[in-house]
Amino acid sequence: MSQPNSILMSYGWDPSIYLEEPKLLEGLKPGRVLAVYGEYSKIIIEQGEKKGIFSGALMASGESIVTGDWVLIREIEGDELCIVEKILPRKTFLRRSNPGKRKGSQAIASNIDLLLVIMGLDNDYSPRRIERYLFLAKVSGAQVTIVLNKKDLCMDPENKFMEIKMIAGETPIEMISALDLKQTRTILQWIDPGKTIAFLGSSGAGKSTIINSLLGGEIQKTNEVKVSDGTGKHTTTRRELFLLPSGGVLMDNPGIREVGLFSEGSEDELEEVFPEIAVAAEECRFNDCSHNEEPNCGVVAAVKDGRISEARYFSYLKLSKELMAYQALNDPEEARKKKQKDKQMSKALQKRLKDKGRK
């Protein structure tokens, strides 16, 4: 079992998991997935790094392993290879929907304590994308902080800061220039020893500069690997965990500009990103109001009298429609409900137009 100041505890291992996983006493050892290279994974255990491959049973289960996972492995004596026998329960799970019209979601990482949403104040700036990232973070279960980068390249950084603050609500926001080491190091206040942080942001937002600054070196250049087998230089489309000199664990991950939304349940997480719409929705006549064409809609009324901005309203409608499309694609029953609701909305609109023509 890992002791204080052990390698695994520096990567965030919680010894209480032993109480929940009796299989740890059956010749298996805990480890954390540092990176995934196709059918192989780099795993850290108390004795050092191993190259993990799936057991037959785990492969047959259809489960996939992602960077950040805690796993149980069986060592192979005298070999750097180990067998991954079990994936331990994930406390947080970062995903996005598959690109295009493919079903399901795409795993990004697991067991993230804090997501840092990085956005540049240059051409990368997009309040609407911040809303998508916030939704992704809400669904994952991780805490979130927004970092606005490149303030040195922005003519009106304070105005943009206030615009994002209106969107972010109580979510903490930092505004920095990644080229200023002192400013970049302010991020360390959010990182506790043993906690794992990951970055969300598009390519060009300045994540690499921030990561290299926090790690004290250009890890982007020295750790490029082949996705197929983990050797040689080939691509940067990988996610990998690194220990921070100041304590804590950092996940280096590729830029993500296109963030397809998904939800396994209701629109509760979306309403957390749009709290003003959730408040106005309490005044709606119908419990299942879509806040679009239904009569006596509290949200539409709030837009008309200026309590909700049109930009936020139309963004909410777009994301809500995207969620419904995802649910319909992955659930035939949801597809039937969506078709029925679209039909009802169409009839309601026709009636409103007809009534308007009579006046």
From Swiss-Prot:
Keywords: Cytoplasm, GTP-binding, Hydrolase, Metal-binding, Nucleotide-binding, Ribosome biogenesis, RNA-binding, rRNA-binding, Zinc. GO terms for biological process: ribosomal small subunit biogenesis. Its cofactor is Zn(2+). Zn(2+) binds at C284, C289, H291, C297. Residues 349-359 have a biased composition (Basic residues). Residues 331-359 are annotated as: Disordered. It is found in: Cytoplasm. Disulfide bonds: none annotated. One of several proteins that assist in the late maturation steps of the functional core of the 30S ribosomal subunit. Helps release RbfA from mature subunits. May play a role in the assembly of ribosomal proteins into the subunit. Circularly permuted GTPase that catalyzes slow GTP hydrolysis, GTPase activity is stimulated by the 30S ribosomal subunit. Monomer. Associates with 30S ribosomal subunit, binds 16S rRNA. PANTHER family: SMALL RIBOSOMAL SUBUNIT BIOGENESIS GTPASE RSGA (PTHR32120:SF10). This is Small ribosomal subunit biogenesis GTPase RsgA. It comes from Leptospira interrogans serogroup Icterohaemorrhagiae serovar copenhageni (strain Fiocruz L1-130). The gene is rsgA.
